[in-house]
Structure formats: C-alpha cells, structure tokens
Amino acid sequence: MNASIIIPTYNEADLLPGLLGDLKAQRGADFELIVADADSTDTTRDVARASGARVVDGGMPAVGRNAGARVANGDILIFLDADVRVPRTFVRRAVAEMKTRELAAGTCPARPISKLTTDRIIHNFANLFIRMNQRSDPHAAGYCLLVRKDAFDRIGGFDESLKVAEDHDLVSRVSEIGPFRMLDSTFVRVSVRRYQKEGRIAYALKAIKIGLYRAAVGEITEDSSVVDYDFGDFSEDDARGSRRVLRQIERGLIKLDRQTSRLDERVIKGNEQRPGAYDQWQRASQSLREAWDALFDSEPDGENAPERHSDR
C-alpha cells in the first residue's frame, strides 16, 4: 500500500463529508483511510465509518495523528485536517513526488476556501515563507503533512507534550534524517474558520508570538499559558469586525502579494541563488513592512476597530 491518510477529528460531522468525498473521488491512488476521533459528541464517527474509514480513538491533534500512524500500513503517511479539500489527483501526485524526490517529509501549498482577497494574500505569503525556509528552518502546517513511515517511526512521531506547533517540531526533527520540501505537483484548499473565530489580525499576531517564543525559549508545552488553543472549538465568530479593518489594509497587502507571487515562482524553479531573487525578497519584505504600518496608521470606524497600543 502506497499511503495511509490520517485525519484527526473532534465534532467534524458537518465538514468531514466534504473531504471524504474528495478522497473517494481520487484517481489512480492506492491508500487506506484512518480517522482518529477525540470522542466526538456528534455523528463524526458514523460519518467516517460510512465512508469506509477505520476509526481509532484520538485526542488532541498530536495524540490523534500518532494513534492513526500506529495502525497505518502505508509507506507514506498523509496527515490532513478534517476541514480541508483536495483535488482528484492529490494522493497520486503527492505520493509520486515524495518518492521521485526521495523526500522524508513534505507539505503542499494552501489555498483558502474564502472569497476574501486578504485570505488569499495571507496564504500566498505563508506558502512563500515555507518555501524560503524549507532547507534552513522547516515549517509545515498540520492541515497537510506527508512523512515517510520509516522516518516517522524513527523519530518517535509527534511530540504529544506540545500545545501548539507540533507539526513544525515534527518536520524539524524529520529533516535531520532526510529532506523536507514543499511539493510542487499539488495543493490543498483550507478552511478559514480559525481566522473567523479569532480574527485575522489576532490570529496573525498569535502566529508571530508562537514563532518568536519557539525561537527564543523553546517549544510550547500543554501546561504553558503562552497561547490558548482549543482543538475543535469554532463556536465564536468575529469575522464582521475583522472585515471592516481588512478592507482598509487590503490595498497595501496586494502590493505584497505581487512581490511574493513573483518570488515564489522563482523559488519553485530552483533559482533561489540568483541575485535577482534576493532583491525581490527584499522588496517583498519592504512591502510587508509598509502594509503593517498601514494597518496601524489607519483609522477604522466602528466599535469593533482595534486600538493601537504602544510600549513606549
């Protein structure tokens, strides 16, 4: 068997059928499907079993993914979140590229399931960040993560003591025994419901905070109060307030998107060493700084507008 697809779930009866339908429609792919469920209170387990998936007991994402991996028979483990969508050729192309490039681990570009230009820009920049750092500081979001089974077992799987960023930690450790790269042949479409719950700006700031803490202090464990994370909790929605602010900074972010898209194309072609690529990265960084300044220099109306705080 070429691959084992492992999906950690908690109360995903509404969105899981979309992904299961995509997987059922896969062409030319040999894989098994495993759902690791964290004791859902809805019909998630019934939905999974009806699709032919093997259901095992899960928990937090790292726990669920490890539980699925323990019973997996595939040479390549493909970890997907329950709310993603994949093209019909996803499994075949992903597995083929992993084998052709002899990768130990990989991820793939993300496209948001959203009509907001801002969401597209955010994901374009995130994709570029992963590509630019795939050799020196590997990152991979858990919504799409591929790992050779032998490499996964060798490093002991996901660190279940971590509260967040267990996906980044995993690919960092895997990269010590084999290459990690972003795949070029396929992609996933990802939900923006976490943005909608926490707000785009708040979510971005949380991501920055996590990155800085990991770089300066270390991994964030379950008993840490550095950030909050509630697996499967999407009950709140403050997207309306976020939209008001985002419309005002969108023009600045579009400038950034043009730069990052051009550079991303160069990285894909393997032209990272060209001086022109470095110069373009510098311009993209400058555009990001300008967009950030525009965010805090704007004066949005309405009670949901964020206040600017200064430590000075």
Task: Go through each PLM region and give its residues.
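Short, acidic, metal-binding catalytic loop of nucleotide-sugar glycosyltransferases
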Residues: 21-30
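A conserved acidic beta->alpha catalytic loop
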Residues: 22, 37-45, 84
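Acidic donor-binding/catalytic loop of UDP-sugar-dependent glycosyltransferases
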Residues: 43, 80-96, 172
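Glycine-rich, basic loop-to-helix element that forms the pyrophosphate-binding segment
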Residues: 57-72
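Short aromatic/hydrophobic "clamp" motif used to bind/position activated sugar donors
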Residues: 77
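Conserved donor NDP-sugar-binding/catalytic core segment of glycosyltransferases
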Residues: 89-118
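A recurrent flexible, glycine/aromatic-enriched loop bordering the glycosyltransferase active site
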Residues: 110-117, 128-150
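Acidic donor-binding loop at a coil-to-helix junction in glycosyltransferase catalytic cores
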Residues: 164-170
